[in-house]
C-alpha cells in the first residue's frame, strides 16, 4: 500500500481504476486511510464497498461529445513513475505528442505493418505495457495479441505464438533465456518473422542460441 500512497500523494490522484481482485482492493483501501481518493473504480470481476463498478457506470454513461476546444499537443497526457533504482520513484510527464513519437517504435523497431500480429511481454506496471503494445503498434496498423497469463512459463508462451500465428514478438532478455531451454521442435514458429528485446542486457549466448533455433536475429 506504500507504493499506492506515495503515488497518490505525488501526483494528486483524483481517481483510481483497478482490477477487482481482493489483494489489490485491500492494498488500495489500506492506502486510502492515509491519502483518500475521491473516486475508486473496479473493472471486475469483483466489486467492493466504496468502489464503483466500471460496467455499471459504463452502461449508463451519456454519449461522448467532442469538446469545442480539444487538448493542445503540449498538454500533459500521462505521467509515468520511474523504477526507483535510486531513491523513490519520480514522475515523468509526457504530452500528447508522446504517443505519436512511438510510430518509430512500431514501424521501424518492431517492423510492423497492417498484416502483423504483434505480442509484447510486459506487465502493466511497466511503461512498456503501453509503448510496446499500443501506440506505435496501432499506428502501424498491426493487430496486438493480448496474452493474460497468471503464471509465466516459456512453454505456454511458445504455444500461444504457435497456435495464434504471431508474426512479431518482443520480450525482455530473461524471457528469451527461458525460451531457449524448451524443445522448439514441438512448436510451429514459421509465422514468426521479427523479434526484439528490451529492458536489460542481452547475454550473447542467448542471442546466438535463439538465432540457431529460429533463424531470427534479435
Segments the model singles out, each with a brief description of its role:
Residues 5, 68, 154-158, 186:
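Short hydrophobic/charged patches on amphipathic alpha-helices used for structural packing
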Residues 42-50, 58-81, 88, 111-117, ...:
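Conserved pre-ATP/AMP-binding loop-to-beta segment of ANL
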Residues 16, 76, 82-85, 118, ...:
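Conserved S/T- and glycine-rich ATP-binding loop of Class I adenylate-forming
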Residues 22-24, 174-176, 202:
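Alpha-helix capping/helix-boundary segments
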Residues 139, 166-170, 180-218:
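Gly/Ser/Thr-rich phosphate-binding loop
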Residues 1-60:
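Structural core segment of the AMP-binding/adenylate-forming
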Residues 100-117, 124-167, 182:
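Conserved AMP-binding/adenylation subdomain of ANL enzymes
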Residues 1-19, 90-93, 120, 143-150:
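Short beta-strand->loop structural element characteristic of the AMP-binding/adenylate-forming
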